[in-house]
């Protein structure tokens, strides 16, 4: 889909026809849909809505009022909000993902190409604080333009190379910056790679839940 959106939007709609019908009876307060996670590559602002429109129509056939979130180009980063347009649907909500500074949150992450950020980046500098001021200003600008508060669908820091205390500090800083703007925040992930919960011992990682 990301490499050739036009060739795959019918397949995407067919998948959502099945998924939406299967979950149609689930309460909306417990289940929202996201048509496609983190559009990137050739899946961008120029074709985003046209690509998603058939899938959204398929969802609405069985879930007429189900909340649906849509993220923008370039992995739905915060800067994608500036060019994100939404369909005319009162139950569609904008989302963005927040992993800034990427050099901290993804240090040593082997799936990052051409190479992952170097190890040893520490969070909490004056530059990091200024980054939050700059990025929350982007949210205010989006709300001023659209009247809608976006949903932070992902945030977190890779646990393999970042001490837990630093992950707690980062998580708290992001929450304290964005939550006062009314931004709902979803942490990635529950138990893997960027975890909040230790499934092996059956408990929350110290400090993460409170952050």
Question: How should each PLM-predicted stretch be described?
Answer:
Residues 23, 59, 139-143, 174, ...:
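Hydrophobic, Leu/Ile/Phe/Ala-enriched alpha-helical segments that form helix-helix packing faces
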Residues 12, 85-88, 111-113, 169-171, ...:
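Short, hinge-like loop/turn segments at secondary-structure boundaries
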Residues 26, 162-211:
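Aromatic-rich peripheral "rim/lid" segments of glycoside hydrolase catalytic domains that contact
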Residues 1-67, 72-80, 91, 194:
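Active-site mouth of glycoside hydrolases
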Residues 15, 19, 51, 55, ...:
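Alpha-helical packing segments of well-folded alpha/beta enzyme cores
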Residues 75, 79-158, 179, 183:
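Glycoside hydrolase catalytic-domain groove-lining segments
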Residues 4-12, 44, 48, 124, ...:
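Residue-level preference for long, well-ordered alpha-helices that form the structural scaffold
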Residues 35-37, 70-72, 96-98, 153-155, ...:
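A cross-domain feature marking catalytic cores of carbohydrate-active enzymes
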């Amino acid at each position: 889909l990301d490499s050739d959106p036009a060739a795959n939007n019918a397949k995407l709609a067919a998948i959502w026809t099945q998924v939406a019908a299967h979950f149609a009876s689930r309460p909306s307060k417990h289940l929202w849909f996201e048509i496609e996670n983190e559009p990137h590559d050739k899946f961008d602002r120029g074709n985003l809505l046209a690509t998603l429109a058939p899938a959204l129509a398929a969802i609405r056939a069985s879930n007429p009022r189900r909340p649906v979130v849509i993220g923008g180009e370039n992995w739905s980063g915060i800067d994608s909000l500036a060019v994100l347009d939404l369909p005319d649907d009162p139950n569609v909500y904008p989302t963005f993902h927040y992993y800034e500074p990427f050099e901290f949150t993804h240090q040593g992450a082997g799936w990052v190409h051409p190479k992952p950020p170097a190890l040893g980046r520490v969070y909490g500098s004056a530059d990091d604080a200024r980054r939050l001021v700059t990025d929350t200003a982007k949210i205010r600008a989006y709300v001023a333009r659209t009247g809608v508060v976006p949903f932070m669908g992902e945030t977190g820091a890779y646990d393999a190379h970042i001490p837990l205390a630093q992950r707690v500090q980062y998580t708290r800083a992001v929450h304290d910056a964005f939550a006062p703007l009314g931004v709902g925040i979803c942490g990635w992930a529950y138990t893997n790679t960027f975890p909040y919960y230790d499934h092996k011992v059956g408990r929350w990682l110290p400090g993460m839940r409170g952050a």
